[in-house]
């Protein structure tokens, strides 16, 4: 997509359909907490997940996948080495690499592991909350474990600086999701629901979804925007359904998976709240 071409709901829906039609294999080296939910999100979306982290097979697995997702949520040294091995294989094949810097800035060990991954080469996409993105950008921000202590809006400038410096698409997620790239493109997505923050793994699942969309859409900025738009609209729709039925966040997790599989074009277009700046 050229810098001048407008991005429309129809474009994003075409990418949703491409994921459903092509069922890309997404290799995720992710954390214990979210592994099952991430896999189910990818399956509901229409993608194919594989969660492999053993040293002896990660390079081979990255060799057959269409995207690689790295998530540093539950780090330990062997997994970090597996991430590097998979990353090298992905780079050799030219498939997209999506990095989720979970808890960046929280501990010295986490920061060292993240620095090593970034030093090995810029990922295609980085997605994190406001605190994580500020930490990756080297500006520092208070963090509370994996939770952000500031809004996504407060981290847009840092995301833009980081994107220009290393060339990655950067997504800051929160009440508003912002997607920026080194060309100066910037989309803001304002769907979603506060209850989504009360289910563990929704943010990590967003990162996995970005991997699936980047596997079928070569413009990483558009792919990231499509993934975040779809998750936001589905989450908003699902929360409204659950609340209307008098149920809570446990039901929301199930309804979210239903929506990822079943949401239609008309509902997506009617609900999408997207601003493309500039």
Curated annotation (Swiss-Prot):
Reaction catalysis annotation: 5-(2-hydroxyethyl)-4-methylthiazole + ATP = 4-methyl-5-(2-phosphooxyethyl)-thiazole + ADP + H(+)
Residue sites binding ATP per the record: 127, 173
MF terms (GO), sorted A to Z: ATP binding; hydroxyethylthiazole kinase activity; magnesium ion binding
Biological process (GO), any one: thiamine biosynthetic process
Domain of life from the UniProt record: Bacteria
CDD domains reported in the protein's UniProt record: THZ_kinase
Annotated binding of substrate, by residue: 51, 201
Pathway: Cofactor biosynthesis; thiamine diphosphate biosynthesis; 4-methyl-5-(2-phosphoethyl)-thiazole from 5-(2-hydroxyethyl)-4-methylthiazole: step 1/1
Top EC class, one word: transferase
Enzyme Commission no: 2.7.1.50
Gene3D superfamilies the record matches: 3.40.1190.20
HAMAP family for the chain: Thz_kinase
Family classification: Belongs to the Thz kinase family.
Function: Catalyzes the phosphorylation of the hydroxyl group of 4-methyl-5-beta-hydroxyethylthiazole (THZ).
Name under which the protein is recorded: Hydroxyethylthiazole kinase
Record organism: Leptothrix cholodnii (strain ATCC 51168 / LMG 8142 / SP-6) (Leptothrix discophora (strain SP-6))
UniProt lineage: Bacteria, Pseudomonadati, Pseudomonadota, Betaproteobacteria, Burkholderiales
């Amino acid at each position: 997509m050229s810098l001048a071409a407008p991005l429309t709901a129809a474009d994003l829906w075409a990418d949703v359909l491409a994921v459903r039609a092509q069922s890309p294999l997404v290799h995720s080296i992710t954390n214990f907490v979210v592994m099952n939910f991430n896999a189910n999100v990818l399956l509901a979306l229409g993608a194919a997940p594989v969660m492999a982290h053993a040293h002896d097979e990660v390079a081979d697995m990255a060799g057959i996948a269409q995207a690689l997702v790295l998530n540093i949520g539950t780090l330990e040294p062997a997994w970090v080495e597996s991430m590097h091995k998979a990353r090298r294989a992905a780079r050799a094949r030219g498939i997209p690499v999506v990095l989720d810097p979970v808890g960046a800035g929280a501990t010295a060990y986490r920061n060292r592991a993240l620095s090593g991954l970034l030093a090995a080469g810029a990922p295609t996409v980085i997605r994190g909350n406001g605190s994580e993105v500020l930490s990756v950008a080297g500006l520092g921000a208070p963090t509370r474990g994996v939770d952000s202590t500031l809004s996504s809006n407060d981290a847009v400038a840092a995301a833009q600086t980081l994107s220009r410096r290393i060339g990655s698409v950067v997504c800051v997620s929160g009440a508003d999701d912002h997607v920026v790239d080194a060309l100066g493109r910037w989309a803001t997505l304002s769907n979603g629901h506060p209850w989504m923050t009360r289910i563990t793994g929704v943010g990590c699942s967003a990162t996995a979804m970005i991997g699936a969309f980047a596997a079928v859409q070569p413009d990483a900025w558009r792919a990231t925007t499509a993934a975040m738009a779809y998750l936001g609209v589905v989450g908003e729709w699902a929360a409204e359904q659950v609340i209307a039925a008098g149920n809570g966040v446990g039901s929301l997790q199930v309804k979210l998976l239903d929506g990822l599989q079943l949401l239609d074009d008309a509902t997506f277009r009617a609900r999408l709240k997207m601003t493309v700046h500039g």
